[in-house]
Regions:
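Conserved Walker B catalytic segment
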Residues: 52-76
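Short glycine-rich substrate-engagement loop in P-loop NTPases that contacts/grips substrate
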Residues: 13-45
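Conserved P-loop NTPase "ATPase switch" module shared by AAA+ and STAND
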Residues: 39-59
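Short regulatory helix/loop adjacent to the ATP-binding pocket of P-loop NTPases
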Residues: 83-98, 112-114
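Structural recognition of the conserved hydrophobic beta-strand(s) that form the central parallel beta-sheet
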Residues: 47-49, 72-80, 100
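A cross-kingdom feature that marks ATP-driven nucleic-acid transaction machinery
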Residues: 1-11, 232, 237-352
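Interdomain hinge/linker elements that couple catalytic modules in large macromolecular machines
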Residues: 114-264
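Catalytic P-loop NTPase motifs of RecA-like helicase/translocase cores
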Residues: 25-27, 53-55, 84-85
Length: 352
């Protein structure tokens, strides 16, 4: 992504420099020396990729020093989702703005592939006006085939470049996150990495599922108390989403009620016979968890912002399970537009 931006905006001059810190060259060279050389030779922009692979423990301090020494230089850096803004990054966080980079929402997918530009909508607007919004969109685009394409290959923007090997690449990315990214950030032993990989392979065939720590610990031969910690690592690395019963105030100690893979594309790549009902729930959780609190609901599938209850299903889904629940809605697949409190599932991919 950084290289693409550089090509589009800085190809004609030498004021911008791109480096990736997983390059072998950085095993005995420091980033701050590169920044100094670039600045002294007229550089004004420095793109730094993969900071979590920097072989020295000083990457955040070096970025801070670059900012302080060369205030005219703009620095853009990327790192694994494993990098949390904690006390070790406090000095750096006061000097820069951090962004979480998610995969594409369905709305972003429609725009990326030049299918249709749809404005962002709020959840409240969707709940109140979904019929009109849906009719406006479906009058211009046959939306259901596009939605099915999105569920299979629309989450990551590189599908166009790797069409025939997309699912294989997703498998490789998942393995690389566990084998390389997590150990680069977390202090874990190789034996733990092996068990974490086994754990992820196991749960990818089970999702979504309710957590039975005793059974899982037997299958991968780890202490029972390690299961929640392993799930938390997979969550931080954007491989799974965890659904808790109410607000999680216990961090890694809390037991999630349900585990999902992070997005439907991963499900199709890792679970060839993925159940469509599970795909639907995975999509809903993925799209809503970006900007909303999504927790386990005892009556429906999801409780959003401690206010709205949602049941997810196919076009024949009924209100039976949530008929007595206030502010409850059906998120239904295989319909262009909904009616009343029955909302087309694809529309939850339009949220801001």
């Amino acid at each position: 992504m950084l290289k693409q931006y550089l090509k589009e905006h800085y190809l004609a001059n030498h004021k911008a420099l791109y480096v990736t810190l997983d390059d072998f060259w950085f095993t005995n060279h420091h980033l701050i020396d590169v920044a100094e050389y670039h600045y002294l030779h007229g550089g004004t922009v420095l793109f730094v990729d993969e900071v979590h692979h920097y072989p020295f423990v000083t990457w955040s301090m070096e970025l801070k020093n670059i900012y302080d020494r060369y205030p005219e230089m703009q620095v853009v850096f990327t790192g694994s989702s494993m990098l949390q803004i904690d006390n070790t990054l406090a000095d750096l966080s006061r000097r820069c703005v951090f962004y979480d980079m998610y995969g594409m929402s369905f709305r972003e997918y429609l725009e990326f592939y030049d299918i249709m530009n749809v404005p962002k909508i709020s959840l409240e607007d969707l709940l109140q006006n979904h019929v009109k919004i849906g009719l406006d969109i479906t009058s211009e685009v046959k939306i259901l085939p596009k939605f099915q394409d999105y569920l299979h290959y629309g989450y990551y923007p590189f599908y166009k470049e790797v069409t025939d090997s997309y699912e294989k690449i997703l498998q490789q990315i998942a393995a690389n996150i566990i084998e390389v990214d997590i150990p680069a950030v977390e202090k874990i032993e190789y034996s733990t990495v092996v068990k974490l990989k086994r754990f992820f392979a196991l749960i990818s065939q089970m999702v979504p599922f309710s957590v039975n720590a005793t059974e899982l610990s037997k299958n991968i031969e780890v202490p029972r108390q390690s299961i929640n910690k392993m799930l938390a690592l997979l969550k931080k690395s954007a491989l799974v989403n965890l659904l808790y019963n109410g607000k999680n105030t216990m961090g890694q100690l809390a037991k999630p009620e349900k585990v999902y893979l992070e997005n439907p594309n991963l499900m199709y790549a890792l679970t060839p016979r993925a159940d469509i009902g599970n795909i639907r729930e995975t999509f809903f959780a993925n799209q809503l968890m970006r900007n909303h609190e999504v927790t386990f609901s005892g009556k429906g599938d999801f409780l959003v912002d401690s206010l709205y209850t949602f049941e997810v299903g196919g076009k024949n889904k009924k209100f039976d399970q949530i008929k007595d629940v206030s502010k409850s809605f059906l998120a239904v697949d295989d319909i262009d537009t909904g009616f009343g409190d029955k909302i087309s599932l694809w529309m939850f991919g339009l949220l801001e």
